[in-house]
UniProtKB/Swiss-Prot annotation:
Keywords: Cataract, Congenital disorder of glycosylation, Disease variant, Endoplasmic reticulum, Intellectual disability, Lipid metabolism, Membrane, NADP, Oxidoreductase, Transmembrane, Transmembrane helix. This is Polyprenal reductase. Its EC number is 1.3.1.94, 1.3.1.22. Its main location: endoplasmic reticulum. Belongs to the steroid 5-alpha reductase family. Polyprenal reductase subfamily. The gene is SRD5A3.
Length: 318
């Protein structure tokens, strides 16, 4: 790789700057939550911004000004509707370019350039980005199915800022994946005779990890949904119960751990070396760790008999 290309590939482009900023924000928030109770800032607005669902309803007194910005947590499905549509469109554009030689729409190519997508991406394999975009779309489709048919949402809330962030998040993730495609002008650039010639061992490993992580996340969501249903599958209440089974035996929020592993599987599919995607993974790590920590606190405060050996997010560690 030419020195100028290597420098461009390693530069802090706008896309990396966004993910680095989000990572720093979630890390700082997590560190603040880990402070001893007496040192933790008591700002109600701050706590309202970072909590959602059961961890929000556990707050003793929420000002009316905070409640004015509540959005039902069941609106989580909107995130995945947007993701399925948007990332499905991006996948269609990439498929057209890879297999039919059709150029990206000019507005999309311009947007990718603004975000920092570089020509040729330093030898990045087009197959890697294609597989990751497929994984992202399948993940979003499964999560949409779970929101509609598996999960049982109570009347708990999320902040409107969290809702807006969720809507933008999967749009940004999809653009991040597409920006890793090696480009020749407005067309995807394929090194070698065809796309399948780019197949590597890490593509197989990444696919296996994705399937494994997705299966565990689905199982954990089924366990959570069944806590509110009878044996016939009918919802009988919306109370919280202690979940057992699968990864719940090790951590309080295995669905968050599985989410992290899904993104790690995509990093593996990129061949381990994609710095931009590792910034995405790091953001997911601190984001999910924060949510898991708050959920762990909720469970321990609500249930006296909560298993002492369970960690919040990482088995045996945290």
């Amino acid at each position: 790789m030419a020195p100028w290309a290597e420098a461009e590939h390693s530069a802090l482009n706008p896309l990396r700057a966004v993910w680095l900023t989000l990572t720093a924000a979630f890390l700082l928030t997590l560190l603040l939550q880990l402070l001893p109770p007496g040192l933790l800032p008591g700002c109600a607005i701050f706590q309202d911004l970072i909590r959602y669902g059961k961890t929000k309803c556990g707050e003793p007194s929420r000002p009316a000004a905070c409640r004015a910005f509540d959005v039902p947590k069941r609106y989580f499905s909107h995130f995945y509707i947007i993701s399925v549509l948007w990332n499905g469109f991006l996948l269609w554009c990439l498929t057209q370019s890879l297999f039919l030689g059709a150029p990206f729409p000019s507005w999309l190519h311009g947007l990718l350039r603004i975000l920092g997508a570089a020509q040729f991406q330093g030898g990045e394999l087009a197959l890697s980005a294609f597989l990751v975009l497929v994984f992202l779309w399948l993940h979003s489709l499964r999560r949409l199915f779970e929101c509609l048919y598996v999960s049982v949402f109570s009347n708990v809330m999320i902040h409107v800022v969290q809702y807006c962030f969720g809507l933008v998040y999967y749009v940004l993730v999809g653009l991040t994946v597409l920006s890793q495609v090696p480009m020749d002008g407005r067309n995807a650039y394929i090194t070698g005779k065809n796309l399948l010639m780019q197949a590597r061992w890490f593509h197989i490993l990444g696919m296996m990890m994705f399937i494994w992580s997705s299966a565990h996340q689905y199982k954990c969501h089924v366990i959570l949904g069944n806590l509110r249903k009878n044996k016939a599958g009918v919802v009988i209440h919306c109370n919280h119960r202690i979940p057992f089974g699968d990864w719940f035996e090790y951590v309080s929020s295995p669905n968050y751990l599985a989410e992290l592993m899904i993104y790690v599987s995509m990093a593996v599919t990129f061949g381990f070396h994609n710095l931009t995607w590792w910034l995405v993974v790091t953001n997911v790590f601190f984001n999910q760790a924060l949510s898991a920590f708050l959920s762990h606190q909720f469970y321990k405060s609500k249930f006296v008999s909560y298993p002492k050996h369970r960690k919040a997010f990482l088995p045996f560690l945290f």
